[in-house]
A protein has these predicted regions:
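C-terminal helical cap(s) of enzyme catalytic domains, especially alpha/beta-barrels
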Residues: 15-21, 121-141
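A structural signal for isolated positions on well-ordered beta-strands in alpha/beta enzyme cores
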Residues: 4-6, 36, 112
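Residue-level preference for alpha-helix termini and adjacent loops
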Residues: 58, 92, 116-119, 130
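Glycine-enriched alpha-helix->loop->beta-strand junction motifs that scaffold or abut catalytic
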Residues: 1-6, 107
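Glycine-rich, proline-tolerant flexible connector loops at the mouths of alpha/beta enzymes
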Residues: 9, 113-125
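Residue-level detector of alpha-helix boundaries and kinks
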Residues: 3, 35, 86-89, 117, ...
Length: 143
């Protein structure tokens, strides 16, 4: 069908496999994104404050994602965390200041914001998007 691929794993060969399979089936492959950064980024002017709000939601999200994993499969969503501190240490879920987000963007080629992850308060999600648009994106556009 030539639909886009947003892979759930960071294995670099997935893009090649996808394109070859599209060709084999007679379809021109769509664009592909192979993620390279955390699976969730929230931008905050006070990460500790927002971790207190996001932590329980993110931990529940990680538990659901873990329950869907099957033996032998790899996924960026795979987490062994059972506490918020463990989740923070893993780095798959991150709450960053605008400057920390800019720095992260210089190291990875994909950024997954996912503002309403697992039922995050829409007002909190909107604040993150406003910080991204107002403080992160302008710095990325000038670099």
């Amino acid at each position: 069908l030539g639909l886009p691929l947003f892979a759930g794993d960071d294995h670099p060969e997935l893009k090649v496999i996808y394109q070859l399979e599209c060709e084999r089936l007679g379809h021109r492959g769509g664009w592909s994104v192979i993620p390279s950064g955390p699976m969730f980024v929230h931008i905050s002017d006070d990460p500790e404050r927002d971790w207190a709000k996001i932590g329980p939601v993110a931990l529940a999200d990680a538990a659901v994602m873990r329950s869907w994993q099957t033996a032998g499969n790899r996924s960026l969503t795979e987490s062994e965390a059972t506490t918020i501190d463990e989740l923070r240490t893993e780095g798959k879920y991150q709450v960053l200041t605008p400057d920390e987000c800019v720095e992260l963007c210089t190291r990875v080629h994909t950024l997954t914001l996912h503002p309403l992850l697992g039922g995050i308060d829409p007002a909190l999600a909107w604040q993150s998007l406003e910080l991204f648009a107002g403080e992160v994106l302008p710095k990325l556009q000038t670099s």
